[in-house]
């Protein structure tokens, strides 16, 4: 489920949207992305890869996953640091849903395993970070996503032009904050958009 190497993602560039949040618009045709926020981990001419940050994985607890993956024995569950219990498990997207990706603050970094993205946010997809979290040596902030969202070359640009997405700068609260159910409206308000008045008019930030 968790890989042993650095995630394979498209290499980005200055003209792309790495580190931005995508906000699904009412015109989004794919129902699995309705009212989603997607943090773009990589975006280039080769395509794009992102993590949905506002869809909880129902009935999945982070501490249960640590036991299932043999990171800790079941008997040590009660010994986990409080920070481990606070890690949310999200549905990161429809691609490779059996694989885990940890978005986290930049205070945790492992060479050849951690991908720095932007503004102090990184991506790691190895068991080492789960062991670090379980041992109280992990990042200050983290979420575990199961699966990811992927786009072929030019696909995301086409969806944005078709008014499928708005984009806005990401911040730690929108990624790691407590209110998963309120993140969508929070992101819209960050752009000065009233969620109650949201229309299908084209445009992006």
Swiss-Prot record:
SUPFAM superfamilies for the chain: VC0467-like
Gene Ontology CC, one term: cytosol
Family annotation (InterPro entries): AlgH-like (IPR003774)
Signal peptide extent: none
Pfam family, one: DUF179
Similarity-based family: Belongs to the UPF0301 (AlgH) family.
Protein name: UPF0301 protein Xaut_2594
Organism, scientific name: Xanthobacter autotrophicus (strain ATCC BAA-1158 / Py2)
Phylogenetic lineage: Bacteria, Pseudomonadati, Pseudomonadota, Alphaproteobacteria, Hyphomicrobiales
């Amino acid at each position: 489920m968790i890989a042993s190497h650095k995630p394979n993602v498209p290499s980005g560039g200055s003209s792309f949207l790495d580190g931005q949040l995508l906000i699904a618009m009412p015109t989004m045709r794919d129902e699995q992305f309705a009212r989603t926020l997607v943090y773009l981990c990589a975006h280039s001419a080769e395509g794009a890869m992102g993590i949905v940050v506002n869809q909880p994985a129902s009935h999945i607890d982070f501490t249960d996953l640590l036991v299932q993956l043999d990171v800790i024995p079941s008997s040590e569950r009660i010994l986990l640091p409080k920070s481990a219990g606070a890690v949310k498990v999200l549905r990161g997207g429809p691609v490779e849903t059996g694989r885990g990706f940890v978005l986290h603050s930049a205070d945790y970094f492992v060479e050849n395993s951690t991908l720095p993205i932007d503004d102090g946010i990184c991506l790691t997809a190895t068991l080492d970070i789960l062991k670090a979290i379980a041992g109280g040596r992990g990042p200050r902030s983290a979420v575990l996503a199961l699966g990811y969202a992927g786009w072929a070359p030019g696909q995301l640009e086409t969806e944005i032009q078709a008014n499928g997405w708005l984009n806005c700068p990401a911040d730690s609260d929108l990624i790691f904050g407590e209110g998963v159910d309120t993140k969508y409206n929070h992101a819209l308000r960050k752009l000065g958009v009233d969620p109650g008045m949201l229309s299908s008019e084209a445009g992006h930030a």
